[in-house]
């Protein structure tokens, strides 16, 4: 949902919607409707556009696949963004409804996960045998990457978003030094959550494999 003003007194200049479904459904509305009213100096960035920008230099066949949640696939955000930059690229997507539950319930590396990982990959490749690049269109999915790579043919490149989104933000700051100079650089991280801290810490440890500082907040 759109950001509430209670979130923006915190001192970060940027919000990254590190969720493909949120980026697909809410980013434009947040940027166009909410930020001008809350604080026009702040920025909210998504994860879909930075991922798409790299594709043109990677795919050789000009056929790519998207593995994502139902919300992201239904939004058609990936085909729309791809065709803005690369009209010649063919895009096919498949929903993977079991992948997020596998990650969030810490079942990603269990043998039972193999069935669902193989199932959705096969569905995608049956749609288009010329696919040579697959985007993991959900920020949960990199935790499944070791198993995904077991079932993806060797000639297909798998794109996890993290490094591309990070490089895009770095490039943004280089192009906007007036924003970069306002950013603190003390290498500290504080996580805010709207759910119970212990539940958040348990989930975050799966992703980050480190101790984190968490503060619970309430959206008004």
Can you say where each PLM-predicted feature lies in the sequence?
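Short, exposed "boundary/linker" segments that immediately precede the start
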Residues: 1-8
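Non-catalytic structural scaffold of enzyme domains
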Residues: 9-220
């Amino acid at each position: 949902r759109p950001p509430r003003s209670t979130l923006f007194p915190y001192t970060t200049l940027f919000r990254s919607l590190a969720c493909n479904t949120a980026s697909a459904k809410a980013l434009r509305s947040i940027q166009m409707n909410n930020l001008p009213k809350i604080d026009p100096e702040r920025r909210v960035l998504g994860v879909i556009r930075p991922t798409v920008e790299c594709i043109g230099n990677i795919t050789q066949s000009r056929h790519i696949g998207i593995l994502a949640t139902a919300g992201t696939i239904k939004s058609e955000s990936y085909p729309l963004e791809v065709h803005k930059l690369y009209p010649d690229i063919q895009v096919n997507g498949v929903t993977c409804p079991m992948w997020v539950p596998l990650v969030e319930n810490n079942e990603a590396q269990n043998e039972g996960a193999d069935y669902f990982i193989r199932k959705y990959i096969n569905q995608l490749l049956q749609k288009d045998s010329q696919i040579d690049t697959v985007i993991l269109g959900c920020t949960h999915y990199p935790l499944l990457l070791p198993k995904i790579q077991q079932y993806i043919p060797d000639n297909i490149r798998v794109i996890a978003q993290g490094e591309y989104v990070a490089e895009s933000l770095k490039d943004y700051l280089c192009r906007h030094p007036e924003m970069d100079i306002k950013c603190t650089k003390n290498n500290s991280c504080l996580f805010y959550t709207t759910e119970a801290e212990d539940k958040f810490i348990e989930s975050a440890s799966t992703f980050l494999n480190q101790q984190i500082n968490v503060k619970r907040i309430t959206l008004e």
